Amino acid sequence: MAIVGGMNPKISDAVWGTSVTRQPRLENASKMKLNSPVIQLFLAPFSNPTIITDDVREVKDILSNRTHEFDRSPRTPDAYRSLLPHCSLVKATGPAFKQQRRFWEGVTGTPFLRRVAEPKMYRCALGLIDLLRAQAKMAGGRPFYCFDDFDVAAFELIWELVFGTNVDAIKNARNKVLCATSDTVQPPSLDSPARIPVIQKPDMCEAVSFFISTVAKSLKSVSQTWHLWYLRQQPVYKRKLAFKNSTIDGLIESTRSELAGLSEGQLMELKESSALVTGVRRQLLAHIRQGQPVDVPFPASVRAEIHDELFMILVAGHETKAVLLSWSVKFLIANPDKQEKLRKALIDVLPKGSNGEQPSVKAILSTSIPYLEAYMEESMRAANTSPRLVRRTTTDTQVLGYSIPKGVSVLLNPYIGTQPLDIPEHLRSETSRNSKGNFESYWDVSGMDDFQPERWLAEDGSFNPRQFPCLTFSAGPRMCYGRNLALMEFRVNLVLLVLNFKFDSLPKDLASMESQQRRFRMPRQCYVRLSPL
């Protein structure tokens, strides 16, 4: 095992994501001229060691098969615990965690996604297209910043899915653009960013973004406990926390009051229309079966569990789509040949109607389009939105032949891109050896630095999801349980964007592929120059 000591700024930045980078954060971090897939870092004097594991096959095995040896590191749960102390994210992998996951599993199940999520995500995606079309007209061929568009569209959908009400954020943003178009004087140069009205995000969207930023700051802090305490003392934190609590608690109570008059049979037959209804309905059924009253507000502990899980879903679902969509659009711009190939693949099977009507959401989600699926998979691989997955050893164990004591933080690099070292099979765990054939390869012999969706296609042109591992949503029991929703949303939005716009080249100073770390690795710049189709 290679050992690195001292406060090396480059190493610290690679580990905690505190710098702006062009490449995924931990790419080659553990193998940097050390010829080892496992290194031991001492990030500060007298600190406990941190282990970095940079072998995707072993990372996949640890996440999927060795959860009794590696549980979630307390660093991430601690960052959320002061905000959401009762959500499943902060719980150790065990009976309480699994029970809470089962309680909410209906929200991510196929019936809910098809009946509730599909029409809502389609409407939001069409709203995003209309907003971008209005902005493109106002820009007059100039580039404009689009991350806020993706952000507010993602928030509108996840808010509707979680709480069941419409915030009309996309419609309001478009109306603001339409009202300002005729009175706005644009820069003379077509390469200068257009002057576009700033999107007014809903108050809860601003609150979510604020709390995400505080979590990101605490994760980068040397003294996380002190930093979190300091943030909680700030007036702005207290205001946004009070707003969040009063809003969500009010929605929980109003929904409980509305459903409390239903009988057990009626509650059983009730179709869940949001995550809020799911949580309240199931809690009311539990109270009825336990002989507890349902015509009074939930006990504080019950309300807190519902509240925290709902807000956790809101936070997770909000940023995932915006970041994935941003990177996929940047890859479209940087690779015009891939953009045209994707558009042709879509037009061949999802042509617009004679009157310009869009393909239906059912057609988008059910039609097999191998190149679309390959493009999505390659986008997720290259974006590497979660560049470090942190676990802590719960017992003395081994990784690739190296002894790791109990209680040590282990940083796992999920990036599929660097050439793996040649590691003897006998050094791998038994579960790793047994699962070797789960994927056809762990490395592309032609190299993986370039953006190549074709690497995910079989010789007959079909999409092969087992070509390489994909750890965008982690793996094992702690895999993101919003994965199916995120992939559906990603697909619908990407299809409609490519069918409705050509993403033209940008000036060099607006086309940087540098990233910055918040909750996810996100692009530092997110500009587009659109030609409506």
State where each predicted segment sits.
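Hydrophobic, well-ordered secondary-structure elements that form the walls
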Residues: 379, 404-407, 451, 476, ...
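N-terminal membrane-proximal hinge/A-helix region immediately C-terminal to the signal-anchor transmembrane segment
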Residues: 1-86, 95-99, 122-127, 131-134, ...
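Cytochrome P450 heme-binding "Cys pocket" and the immediately downstream C-terminal segment
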Residues: 167, 336-339, 472-479, 483-523
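Cytochrome P450 I-helix active-site segment
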Residues: 197-204, 269, 334-385, 400, ...
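C-terminal helix/juxtamembrane-tail motif
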Residues: 521-533
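Conserved cytochrome P450 K-helix/beta-meander segment immediately N-terminal to the heme-binding cysteine loop
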Residues: 412-461
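Short, small-residue alpha-helix embedded
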Residues: 320-333, 493
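Cytochrome P450 heme-thiolate monooxygenase catalytic core
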Residues: 74-78, 116-325
